[in-house]
Amino acid sequence: MAVATQSLEELSINAIRFLAVDAIEKAKSGHPGLPMGAAPMAFVLWNRFMRYNPKNPKWFNRDRFVLSAGHGSMLQYALLYLTGYDSVSIEDIKQFRQWESKTPGHPENFMTAGVEVTTGPLGQGIANGVGLAIAEAHLAAKFNKPDAKIVDHYTYVILGDGCNMEGVSGEAASFAGHLGLGKLIALYDDNHISIDGSTDVAFTEDVSKRFESYGWHVIHVKDGNTDLEAIHKAIEEAKAVTDKPTMIKVTTIIGYGSPNKSNTAGVHGAALGGDEVALTRQNLGWSHDPFVVPEDVLNYTRKAVERGAGYESDWNKTYADYKAKYPQEAAEFERYLSGKLADGWDKVLPSYTPEDKGLPTRKHSETCLNKLAAVLPELIGGSADLTHSNLTEIKGKGDFQKGQYQNPNIHFGVREHGMGAICNGIALHGSGLIPYGATFLIFSDYMRAPIRLSALSQAGSIWVMTHDSIGQGEDGPTHQPIETLASLRAIPNLTVIRPADGNETSGAYKVAIERAKNNAPTLLAFTRQNVPNLAGTSIDDVAKGGYIVVDTDGTPDLILIGTGSELSLCVTAAEKLKAEGKKVRVVSLAAWDLFDAQDAAYKESVLPKAVTKRLAVEAASSFGWHKYIGSEGDAVTIDRFGASAPGGVCLEKFGFSVDNVLAKAKQLLG
């Protein structure tokens, strides 16, 4: 094919392909197959349909684009460069996959303006997309008026065979179909190739029928390599279907244009090699040097800048009219978008004294959620089919269902993994919504990827985890977390808080809400069983991670360190030791990372180096505790699986009793 016969659209599509090929060749690393095969569908979408403003990547009413098949990241970087985003220059493309570049191996929303979510682990992106679409539907139902639609945008996702093999995509797609999210459109790059070769070796189901059974509208574009009009008509049709999401199956050839590697696994995840690049240039009629895009092509693709300015200008006029007619709603909408919390929001968090009835911290959590929801209507979330165990319902506010998108209570069903990724999508919508997702702490293992990605991608999700220890009881070791807290505490940028009573639960929510507004996730671990309200606990001191709950005159002989339900054991043991003339301090270490972040003087004031006799008490693994107890300390912990018995029996049998804490303390004291 000669260059002269190609239209500007065809040249633009080849520009995408060769920016990807050249960047991957220079890096000697990457995945050229998807960008080469999916370039036509991506360009038709970005050039003819998507509404966005390259000069204002955070314009609120933009359409959201998610590359769920994140390994094909050069597809997105090429699009950002060609359409005029300042975040990706040709120099950035040359630095693909290099140290501190804005073009990392997989898309990272915190590195590259124009990237909405961090993708890479396959299937996360389509589930994030469901979250983005939920956010749009919720805000539209809350704020739009018959004469003014200020929330009106689509979520587009490109996903691949690998995404569709992953369980999380099935969870999320099933849920999206149930909800009838009509502004969610997924383009499935159906190229039949995975790393191991043809997908025939492992993946032979009818994906279209599967999505139809989920309640999606399904369209098939048989030639995704050259039939641009078929792609156009499919997206047009998808937008016309408003009562259900649409999956457009676009059959493509992976590595399209490569004479010897197209339609093979060899083009999936490795550079083409110099000889094959030259042959591909010849085959596709691309005579330009590496990283060179002809001026006429750039002029054409960068018409997106003018279009985008127009889209935003039109929306600004719509919003100005809305604000004039509905000033109260506009003020609240602007508060959402600004990330500002309602004045005095934290004053609703309850405080407790020892005279108040002891309750499970999950019950205190329910109280906090409902108090907060009354002043922070941006809270939205729910449980993975454990609403009445996790106690996460916002009472009197209704369920988020098809036709009832204004309501905040989401029933995620038994879909922990999907729930996590959906919550991240809601958080990363950029509209001030605060999502929360709940399950038993042990089942955080089912959603570890999205919990980790919330921390990596700076998503302000709140993870509400109940039944946090062997105190869970009769369900037995399959449901009793042991190593779970340690593994979660190891995730960078994730704050894990295990509150001891009502005051600390209020403090935990205060931290979680503030972190959410600062684009950081928090995991809260709550008890199934009752715990007493303690005299020395503090709402505000939870933010320090660790603080003194019970103190003594002078230098302590012993420091007892506890979290959650075991803090009360420490307090009671300290009282008994005090009666025997011992000087004992009790420290709550509810959030390790928050304590670690305090200055050295504060940490020394709580855990002085001179006091080496320290005893940690936590109904979880000992892993990580030696940082705080030192080589001369000890721990009452559990480093084996639990057992099926009433929770109190489990705790007693495994040594979580005042008597055992006393015995261990006396051993340390000599």
UniProtKB/Swiss-Prot annotation:
SMART domains the UniProt entry points to: Transket_pyr
Protein family membership: Belongs to the transketolase family.
GO cellular component, one term: cytosol
UniProt GO MF annotations: metal ion binding; transketolase activity
Keyword set, alphabetical order: Calcium, Magnesium, Metal-binding, Thiamine pyrophosphate, Transferase
Binding site for Mg(2+): 161, 191, 193
Reaction catalyzed: D-sedoheptulose 7-phosphate + D-glyceraldehyde 3-phosphate = aldehydo-D-ribose 5-phosphate + D-xylulose 5-phosphate
Binding site residues for thiamine diphosphate: 71, 120-122, 162, 191, 268, 443
Protein name: Transketolase
Binding-site list for substrate: 31, 268, 362, 389, 467, 475, 528
Required co-factors: Mg(2+); Ca(2+); Mn(2+); Co(2+)
Cofactor note: Binds 1 Mg(2+) ion per subunit. Can also utilize other divalent metal cations, such as Ca(2+), Mn(2+) and Co(2+). Binds 1 thiamine pyrophosphate per subunit.
Pfam families with a match to the protein in the record: Transket_pyr, Transketolase_C_1, Transketolase_N
InterPro entries on file: THDP-binding (IPR029061), Transketo_C/PFOR_II (IPR009014), Transketolase-like_C_2 (IPR055152), Transketolase-like_Pyr-bd (IPR005475), Transketolase_bac-like (IPR005478), Transketolase_BS (IPR020826), Transketolase_CS (IPR049557), Transketolase_fam (IPR033247)
Keyword Acyltransferase: no
Site (Important for catalytic activity): 31, 268
Entry keyword annotation includes Metal-binding: yes
Functional description taken from the UniProt entry: Catalyzes the transfer of a two-carbon ketol group from a ketose donor to an aldose acceptor, via a covalent intermediate with the cofactor thiamine pyrophosphate.
Example GO BP: pentose-phosphate shunt
Annotated catalytic residues: 416 (proton donor)
Quaternary state and interactors: Homodimer.
